[in-house]
From Swiss-Prot:
<dbReference type="InterPro" id="IPR011607">
    <property type="entry name" value="MGS-like_dom"/>
</dbReference>
<feature type="binding site">
    <location>
        <position position="299"/>
    </location>
    <ligand>
        <name>Mg(2+) 1</name>
    </ligand>
</feature>
<feature type="region of interest" description="Allosteric domain">
    <location>
        <begin position="945"/>
        <end position="1083"/>
    </location>
</feature>
<feature type="binding site">
    <location>
        <position position="719"/>
    </location>
    <ligand>
        <name>ATP 2</name>
    </ligand>
</feature>
<comment type="pathway">
    <text>Pyrimidine metabolism; UMP biosynthesis via de novo pathway; (S)-dihydroorotate from bicarbonate: step 1/3.</text>
</comment>
<dbReference type="InterPro" id="IPR036914">
    <property type="entry name" value="MGS-like_dom_sf"/>
</dbReference>
<feature type="region of interest" description="Carbamoyl phosphate synthetic domain">
    <location>
        <begin position="558"/>
        <end position="944"/>
    </location>
</feature>
<comment type="subunit">
    <text>Composed of two chains; the small (or glutamine) chain promotes the hydrolysis of glutamine to ammonia, which is used by the large (or ammonia) chain to synthesize carbamoyl phosphate. Tetramer of heterodimers (alpha,beta)4.</text>
</comment>
<dbReference type="InterPro" id="IPR033937">
    <property type="entry name" value="MGS_CPS_CarB"/>
</dbReference>
<feature type="region of interest" description="Carboxyphosphate synthetic domain">
    <location>
        <begin position="1"/>
        <end position="402"/>
    </location>
</feature>
<feature type="binding site">
    <location>
        <position position="299"/>
    </location>
    <ligand>
        <name>ATP 1</name>
    </ligand>
</feature>
<comment type="pathway">
    <text>Amino-acid biosynthesis; L-arginine biosynthesis; carbamoyl phosphate from bicarbonate: step 1/1.</text>
</comment>
<dbReference type="GO" id="GO:0006526">
    <property type="term" value="P:L-arginine biosynthetic process"/>
</dbReference>
<feature type="binding site">
    <location>
        <position position="241"/>
    </location>
    <ligand>
        <name>ATP 1</name>
    </ligand>
</feature>
<keyword id="KW-0067">ATP-binding</keyword>
<dbReference type="GO" id="GO:0005737">
    <property type="term" value="C:cytoplasm"/>
</dbReference>
<keyword id="KW-0479">Metal-binding</keyword>
Length: 1083
């Protein structure tokens, strides 16, 4: 085979932290690529900053560097490892941009590193808007009329040619960052300036608007012999104007005529050849004007993308794996198809089912943000479903979103027929403006008597889709007319199930319970069957067990053999509070079961993840995580147990229902999980063990809440029970705040009680992850938080080993952990959050909460210590003892590891960025060094907070941080920085002999801090808030800082750590080291 033997060592650059526009799909593609290249005998060096990935496991690559993704840091890795080649196309936009920077700064030439799959010229031709336009003109393909500009003056000239509305698109960004639609000249100027700021090359394209056109994507692969195949054609349900990452998408394309498809296919082949992507996958986006059929090319990603992951999962064709092998010289016809084992990769996949992807949003976390969907991506996750028909697939996707919908209406989310039923005017407004709820308003429009033609005129959604949704309403109306469950006959029930109606919807329509509908359905002999995802529409036998459910006659799942079977329930779509960290745990659970000779069965609905790769588990079910879908799988597979500990809140919410249906839950019991969540039971348990908790109470209504607040006192922490990610959690400092926040907490709690705790001000928060086998408990990691208590643990930076806790406090933490594990009879993972508060001269330990499940810190602990925490916990749950696994001592590394959170504020203009008890981060990074200060500096750099070496720093600390302001000010002056401050802080600093330039508050006129930001004349903002919210002066300053790309630190502890890091960076260079070498030094 003609694979390249002149290359021995290959560098892969990962995509960094999970952010909006770039999520787990790049962990999936990078992991596949590492496996594929090592399979071929190449040595793989990986650089990535995200510890929560399978890609950064020490077993995935030969040398793994968890380091910031800047060209300067990657150069140090290259100098140390001396790779022969760099594969830049599998790390998303981040990896591509770092590769381009390495090339532009002469690093690749200096060390003789060859870029494979796509070189810098090819990447620039695809990514730079003007070059791409010229390339399309050359091959006779139409593009939007547009002009590439680098200044606002040139943008205004372009607008005169293009006209309004106009689309602003920055070059070299992902997830549509900085892209927007301008409807008037005033907006245009600010949108262009923002676009220029966000483009790493300060370049934007001003182009004609094609809002309302139909949008399509083609996934294309090419090898070095110029063989090109189309993997998948994807159609956007939402028309142009909504970023494809925020659109509902369907595969295969449903509304293209054969002639249109062939024209688009021919164009795709021409594009990939003209741009010159030598090998691998590319994603090409098209728009079609529905009335004239005019087709234009929108853009091309010369790399594996979010859509590539979707196309891989939709077809079963492993795009990233094949792309990696093509990059080292293989041809498509030489590579076997893993699924059929008979066909080759040059066979274009054919599918006999319909796939629907739906985006998941988090606007509830950012109430001040504009929730309109535009050309800039805002969704934080997605779910994918597979069905035999569009209707079945569409309804399964809606229930896979986990937003309270169990299909297209007739469920707890449905407003129709309630007191909140929208009016005709509200419906028309929601249809004409794209938003996350628009799909539900299409239902209300039909229920209100609007026609498909009227809905099309308001939404531009293709009539074919609307006709199918109208048929779902007709089926629902038919069921309502029948009325009683017992009156529904077999044919009607089967027809409803084939159209994707859930038992929950039928229960709502017939006023019965879900379990009654399930019993009736089973009595009728109506069960789902499971079909294979096989790449070939059943033409060849499939050898990889990858299944979806549908209501037909013949099932394809294998009968149970001699092996034990265990089901792992995944986490569903990413959301803030439940993301890649839990998928990491699910993957390790599967690997551990396989090592023990137990058949692992993965159930998940997230197309971005490694857990839904067909070779992560023995059997994969791509299904929504609802009680109905999971019980159906358990009926078909007869597992010996189900793991609910690893997928976050989603599987925990199903645990009780599964247990009641007779499904065995392995590991910690459901009763223990409930005890830890039940405030009253847990409080009495804490008292029984002689441990401390902050004073707390529980309220089921507003009157009880007032009584509890009076007893507990302020500041008080208010939160609903049974939620993840601190949803609707707030700190209240007085009664008026309390009344406002408690009302919201009751809405979110949805019938569950609201919890009220005394908030411990100025306490240090500590996270502990441990494994217990029911007898012994071993601590895996003690993490000290850098931000004080009150910032959600998911948003706070934390450090292993702890940096300020005394040995007596650590001993007390260890003792409390063991007591709790024993009393709760934990089998598997456990996470405890402690707070240490100085009371007089003595530190006092409080227990904040206990979670007898995987926490989001498990991957970080595993990377910091080198211990495969989730793998060991799974083996304990499957019956091994810690002694049998030789796990007896807490691992304490010699190096310092700091986890830092990454926040999405740049996508939500105008939102105040102050951190609080509700989690808002989308991802995380890790900084590693022998020194705390350098590890912290690395974590900041990796998270995008570039600590400056010179320039101006705005310092504004609240009144209770006076002394800290003085010491920070002195340190910054000694480092050579110039200080800016408003009146109050300036007076304090000057009184202590610290030179400062005064700036006016926004309300006082000019020059104020926003003027400095606009002039690029401030490099860092250190601001601890005295007030919160985007409407305050401070809030506006913080939000403006984010939009201008200026780092903004809002807690005193982080500000002090940042100044320590800036001092250390003067004297100590950032060194890089692989995890494998670090772990060897710990032994």
């Amino acid at each position: 085979m003609p694979r390249r033997d002149d290359i021995k060592k290959i560098l892969l650059i990962g995509s960094g932290p999970i952010v909006i526009g770039q999520a787990c799909e790049f962990d999936y593609s990078g992991t596949q690529a590492c496996k594929a290249l090592r399979e071929e005998g190449y040595e793989v060096v990986l650089v990535n900053s995200n510890p929560a990935t399978i890609m950064t496991d020490p077993a995935t690559a030969d040398a793994t560097y968890i380091e910031p993704l800047t060209w300067q840091i990657v150069e140090k890795v290259i100098a140390k490892e001396r790779p022969d080649a760099l594969l830049p196309t599998l790390g998303g936009q981040t990896g591509l941009n770092v590769a381009m920077d390495l090339d532009a700064n002469g690093v690749l030439e200096k060390y003789g590193v060859e870029m494979i799959a796509a070189n810098a010229k090819v990447i620039a031709k695809a990514e730079e808007r003007e070059q791409f336009k010229q390339a399309m003109d050359k091959i006779g393909l139409d593009v939007c009329k547009g002009f590439t500009v680098r200044t606002l003056a040139d943008a205004r000239k372009a607008l005169a040619e293009v006209g309004l509305p106009a689309v602003v698109r920055p070059s070299f960004t992902m997830g549509g960052s900085g892209s927007a639609i301008a409807y008037n000249k005033d907006d245009f100027d600010s949108l262009v300036q923002n676009g220029l700021d966000q483009s790493p090359v300060t370049e934007v394209l001003i182009e004609e608007s094609i809002i309302g056109w139909k949008e399509y994507e083609m996934e294309v692969m090419r090898d070095c012999d110029d063989n090109v195949v189309i993997i998948c054609a994807i159609e956007n349900f939402d028309p142009m104007g909504v970023h494809t990452g925020d659109s509902i998408t369907v595969a295969p394309a449903q509304t293209l005529s054969d002639k249109e498809y062939q024209r688009m296919r021919d164009a795709s082949l021409a594009v990939i050849r003209e741009i010159g992507v030598e090998t691998g996958g590319s994603n090409i986006q098209f728009a079609i004007e529905p009335d004239t059929g005019r087709m234009i090319v929108i853009e091309m990603n010369p790399r594996v993308s979010r859509s590539s992951a979707l196309a891989s999962k939709a077809t079963g064709f492993p795009i990233a794996k094949i792309a990696a092998k093509l990059a080292v010289g293989y041809r498509l016809w030489e590579l076997p198809n893993d699924i059929t084992q008979k066909t080759k990769a040059c066979f274009e996949p054919t599918i006999d089912y319909v796939v629907t992807k739906m985006p998941r949003f988090a606007f509830e976390k950012f109430p001040e943000a504009d929730a309109t969907l535009t050309t800039q991506m805002k969704s934080v996750g997605e779910t994918m479903s597979i069905g035999r028909t569009f209707q079945e697939s569409f309804q399964k996707a809606l229930r896979g979103l986990e937003v309270g919908a169990f299909g297209f209406g007739s469920d707890p989310k449905d407003l129709w027929g309630t007191e909140d039923q929208p009016s005709r005017d509200e419906i028309r407004a929601k249809l004409s403006t794209p938003g996350s709820e628009r799909v539900f308003y299409i239902r209300y429009a039909f229920k209100d008597g609007m026609t498909a033609a009227e809905i099309h005129s308001l939404t531009n959604i293709d009539p074919w889709f609307l006709d199918h949704l109208q048929q779902l309403i007709e089926t629902e109306d038919n069921l309502r007319a029948i009325g009683k469950l017992d009156a529904i006959d077999v044919d009607t029930m089967r027809d409803a199930k084939r159209r994707g109606f859930s038992d929950r919807q039928i229960a709502t329509i017939t006023s019965k319970t879900e379990s009654q509908v399930r019993a009736k359905r089973l009595e009728m002999g109506i069960r789902p069957v499971y079909k294979s995802v096989d790449t070939c529409a059943a033409e060849f036998e499939a050898f990889t067990p990858y299944y979806y459910s549908t209501y037909e006659s013949e099932t394809e799942v294998p009968a149970k053999g001699d092996k034990k079977r265990v089901v792992i329930l995944g986490g569903g779509p990413n959301r803030i509070g439940q993301g890649i960290e839990f998928d990491y745990c699910c993957c390790h659970a599967s690997f551990a079961l396989q090592e023990m000779g137990i058949e692992s069965i993965m159930v998940n609905s997230n197309p971005e993840t490694v857990s839904t790769d067909y070779d992560t588990s023995d059997i994969l079910f791509f299904e929504p995580l609802t009680i109905e879908d999971v019980l159906n799988i358990c009926d078909a597979m007869q597992p010996d147990g189900v793991i609910v500990q690893f997928g976050g809140q989603t599987p925990l919410n199903l645990a009780r229902g599964l247990e009641q249906a007779g499904v065995p839950i392995i590991g910690t019991s459901v009763d223990t999980i409930d005890t830890a969540e039940d405030r009253e039971l847990f409080s009495s348990l804490i008292d029984e063990l002689g441990l401390r908790q902050p004073p707390s109470g529980i309220a089921r209504n507003m009157d009880e809440a007032r009584v509890e607040a009076k007893r507990i006192g302020y500041p008080a922490l208010v939160r609903p029970s049974f939620v993840l990610g601190g949803r609707a959690m707030e700190i209240c400092y007085d009664h008026s705040q309390f009344a406002r926040y408690v009302a919201e907490a009751f809405i979110v709690a949805d019938g569950q009680p609201v919890l009220i705790d005394r908030f411990l001000e100025d306490a240090t928060e500590v996270d502990v992850d441990a494994i217990s086998d029911g007898n012994d408990c071993v601590i895996m990691g003690i993490m000290e938080h850098i931000e004080e208590a009150g910032v959600h643990s998911g948003d706070s930076a934390c450090c292993i080993p702890p940096f300020s806790l005394t040995q007596p406090v650590l001993a007390e933490i260890r003792d409390a952990t063991r007591k709790l594990a024993a009393r709760l009879n934990v089998v598997g993972l456990m996470n405890i959050q402690f707070a240490v508060k100085m009371e007089g001269t003595q530190p006092t330990l409080y227990i904040l909460e206990v979670n007898p499940r995987a926490s989001r810190t498990v991957p970080f602990v595993a990377k910091a210590t080198g211990v495969p925490v989730a793998n060991l916990a799974t083996k304990v749950m499957a019956g091994k003892t810690l002694k049998e696994l030789n796990v007896t001592e807490e691992p304490i590394p010699r190096h310092v590891s700091i986890k830092e959170s990454v926040l999405p504020f740049r996508k939500f203009a105008g939102v105040d960025i102050v951190l609080g008890p509700e989690m808002r981060s989308t991802g995380e990074v890790m900084g590693v060094s022998e020194l705390f200060s350098i590890a912290f500096a690395k974590s900041q750099l990796a998270a995008g907070t570039v600590l400056p070496e010179s320039g101006k720093i705005f310092l504004s600390l609240s009144a209770n941080h006076k002394e800290a302001a003085e010491s920070l000010g002195k340190s910054l002056i000694e480092l050579g920085f110039e200080l800016l401050a408003t009146e109050g802080t300036a007076v304090r600093l000057e009184a202590n002999g610290i030179a400062v330039t005064r700036v006016k508050k926004l309300s006082e006129g000019h020059p104020n801090l926003i003027d400095y930001l606009k002039n690029d004349d401030v490099q860092l903002i250190l601001n601890t808030p005295s007030g919160k919210g985007a409407r305050t002066d401070e809030g506006k300053i913080r939000a403006a800082g984010v939009q201008h790309g200026v780092p903004c630190i809002t807690t005193l502890a982080a500000a002090e750590a940042a100044v320590r890091a800036m001092v250390a960076m003067r004297d100590t260079p950032m060194e890089v080291e692989s995890l494998q070498r670090r772990y060897a030094q710990n032994v």
